[in-house]
């Protein structure tokens, strides 16, 4: 990108950006929730739309001069509805967490009981963690995975739901590598007359391209982030049935937010447009292929995959048999140029600051053009680095840098 002005006005900050640019360019990015946006997304994010205040919704604003940003928001909403065949869309949430908060506030009262997936079993902070607003404002109870299969225990979920009769059941996850049966969860919700909310932040790209069953026909509310597999700007969005549209919109504004970020909404419109193209479907298909190959290769090296494998874009790896913690593995792999994150595993015995596992995903490297052969190399690099962690690994770091040079971040820039 052109940083001509920043170079003159704030070289100190520009230096920091350049260092991060170099890190992204020459590291293998395996954090499952990260991706690389297109230059078009970044251009929209950096546009003068950032100057415009637009409290309210299109054609019903509290400020004048909104006729063109109204067009932008309408475009983003219509593209998002088309992408997921949804009745209503709100593109104003600043983040996935705020999208979740707005849904809770739209139909629930403080103290209401909600059933969500346990964070250590793959859920998310906003699904009831006691350190999060969700766990503080609502009476969250949790379901998790079966100890043997390490997949969602739907019988346990049903049993807990029948015993506690929550007002809402939340599904979706941040570290769950398998298909989620939304139809089964809908049936449980109907049995106890509960709202159904799905947080599809991680799998939105798979849902958009038919690689994961869509929650939209089943759920009352579906939330997502717009980065991750959707490859857009950092932000959130809400889809819902038309009958909840007013309640959801009011919960976002004036409920928990003021003015929307119009430059971000423009960038969301770009990413939704990109996701409607055929080449995006091919990209997501490659993400799934890459993740499966990476998982199989790691298994061949003796790594234990939670649930035995993957159906989506991520892998959760139990490192116990490798005699290294998630924290130490994250630091070690970072030193050679592979970026991962430490992650708790189901029935975790270590602190969330240490962890027994790591979570990895392929959306970012697939955006760069990595395919199956590169996945085999990544598995080799990971295994070699962990097995030879007491040795000098400079040759691995150099090999990683060479692969990254072959696949620049923006090949047509």
Curated annotation (Swiss-Prot):
<dbReference type="GO" id="GO:0005829">
    <property type="term" value="C:cytosol"/>
</dbReference>
<keyword id="KW-0554">One-carbon metabolism</keyword>
<dbReference type="InterPro" id="IPR039429">
    <property type="entry name" value="SHMT-like_dom"/>
</dbReference>
<dbReference type="GO" id="GO:0019264">
    <property type="term" value="P:glycine biosynthetic process from serine"/>
</dbReference>
<feature type="binding site">
    <location>
        <begin position="351"/>
        <end position="353"/>
    </location>
    <ligand>
        <name>(6S)-5,6,7,8-tetrahydrofolate</name>
    </ligand>
</feature>
<feature type="binding site">
    <location>
        <begin position="123"/>
        <end position="125"/>
    </location>
    <ligand>
        <name>(6S)-5,6,7,8-tetrahydrofolate</name>
    </ligand>
</feature>
<feature type="binding site">
    <location>
        <position position="119"/>
    </location>
    <ligand>
        <name>(6S)-5,6,7,8-tetrahydrofolate</name>
    </ligand>
</feature>
<comment type="pathway">
    <text>Amino-acid biosynthesis; glycine biosynthesis; glycine from L-serine: step 1/1.</text>
</comment>
<comment type="subunit">
    <text>Homodimer.</text>
</comment>
<comment type="similarity">
    <text>Belongs to the SHMT family.</text>
</comment>
<keyword id="KW-0808">Transferase</keyword>
<dbReference type="InterPro" id="IPR015421">
    <property type="entry name" value="PyrdxlP-dep_Trfase_major"/>
</dbReference>
<protein>
    <recommendedName>
        <fullName>Serine hydroxymethyltransferase</fullName>
        <ecNumber>2.1.2.1</ecNumber>
    </recommendedName>
</protein>
<dbReference type="InterPro" id="IPR015424">
    <property type="entry name" value="PyrdxlP-dep_Trfase"/>
</dbReference>
<dbReference type="GO" id="GO:0030170">
    <property type="term" value="F:pyridoxal phosphate binding"/>
</dbReference>
<keyword id="KW-0028">Amino-acid biosynthesis</keyword>
<dbReference type="GO" id="GO:0004372">
    <property type="term" value="F:glycine hydroxymethyltransferase activity"/>
</dbReference>
<dbReference type="InterPro" id="IPR049943">
    <property type="entry name" value="Ser_HO-MeTrfase-like"/>
</dbReference>
<keyword id="KW-0963">Cytoplasm</keyword>
<dbReference type="InterPro" id="IPR019798">
    <property type="entry name" value="Ser_HO-MeTrfase_PLP_BS"/>
</dbReference>
<dbReference type="InterPro" id="IPR001085">
    <property type="entry name" value="Ser_HO-MeTrfase"/>
</dbReference>
<dbReference type="GO" id="GO:0035999">
    <property type="term" value="P:tetrahydrofolate interconversion"/>
</dbReference>
<feature type="site" description="Plays an important role in substrate specificity">
    <location>
        <position position="227"/>
    </location>
</feature>
<comment type="function">
    <text>Catalyzes the reversible interconversion of serine and glycine with tetrahydrofolate (THF) serving as the one-carbon carrier. This reaction serves as the major source of one-carbon groups required for the biosynthesis of purines, thymidylate, methionine, and other important biomolecules. Also exhibits THF-independent aldolase activity toward beta-hydroxyamino acids, producing glycine and aldehydes, via a retro-aldol mechanism.</text>
</comment>
<dbReference type="InterPro" id="IPR015422">
    <property type="entry name" value="PyrdxlP-dep_Trfase_small"/>
</dbReference>
<dbReference type="Pfam" id="PF00464">
    <property type="entry name" value="SHMT"/>
</dbReference>
<keyword id="KW-0663">Pyridoxal phosphate</keyword>
<comment type="pathway">
    <text>One-carbon metabolism; tetrahydrofolate interconversion.</text>
</comment>
<feature type="modified residue" description="N6-(pyridoxal phosphate)lysine">
    <location>
        <position position="228"/>
    </location>
</feature>
């Amino acid at each position: 990108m052109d940083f001509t002005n920043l170079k003159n006005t704030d070289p100190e900050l520009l230096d920091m950006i350049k260092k991060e640019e170099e890190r992204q360019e020459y590291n293998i990015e395996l954090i499952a929730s990260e991706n690389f946006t297109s230059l078009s997304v970044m251009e929209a994010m950096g546009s003068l739309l950032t100057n415009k205040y637009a409290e309210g919704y299109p054609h019903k604003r509290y400020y004048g001069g909104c006729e063109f940003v109204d067009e932008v928001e309408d475009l983003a909403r219509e593209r998002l509805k088309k992408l997921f065949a949804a009745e209503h869309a709100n593109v104003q949430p600043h983040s996935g967490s705020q999208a979740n908060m707005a849904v809770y506030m739209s139909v629930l009262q403080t103290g209401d009981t909600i059933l969500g997936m346990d964070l250590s079993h793959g859920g998310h902070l906003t699904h009831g963690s006691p350190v999060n607003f969700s766990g503080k404002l609502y009476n969250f109870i949790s379901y998790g995975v079966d100890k043997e299969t390490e997949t969602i225990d739907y019988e346990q979920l049903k049993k807990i739901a029948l015993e506690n009769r929550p007002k809402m059941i939340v599904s979706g996850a941040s570290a769950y590598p398998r298909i989620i049966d939304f139809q089964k969860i809908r049936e449980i919700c109907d049995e106890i007359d509960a709202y159904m909310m799905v947080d599809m932040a991680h799998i939105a790209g798979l849902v958009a391209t038919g690689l994961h069953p869509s929650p939209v026909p089943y759920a009352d509310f579906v939330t997502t982030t717009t980065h991750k597999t959707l490859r857009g700007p950092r932000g959130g969005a809400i889809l819902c049935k038309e009958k909840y549209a007013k309640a959801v919109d009011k919960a976002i504004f004036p409920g928990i937010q003021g003015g929307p970020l119009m430059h971000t909404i423009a960038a969301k419109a770009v990413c939704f447009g990109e996701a409607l193209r055929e080449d995006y479907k091919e990209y997501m298909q490659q993400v799934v292929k890459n993740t499966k190959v990476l998982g199989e290769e790691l298994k061949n090296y003796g790594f234990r995959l939670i649930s035995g494998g993957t159906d989506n874009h991520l892998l959760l790896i139990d490192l116990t048999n490798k005699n290294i913690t998630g924290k130490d593995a994250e630091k070690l792999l970072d030193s050679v140029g592979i970026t991962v994150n430490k992650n708790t595993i189901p029935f975790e015995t270590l602190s969330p600051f240490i962890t027994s596992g790591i979570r990895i995903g392929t959306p970012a490297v697939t955006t760069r053009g990595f395919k199956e052969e590169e996945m085999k190399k990544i598995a080799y690099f990971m295994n070699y680095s962990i097995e030879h962690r007491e040795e000098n690994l400079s040759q691995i770091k150099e090999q990683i840098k060479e692969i990254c040079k072959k696949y620049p971040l923006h090949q047509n820039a």
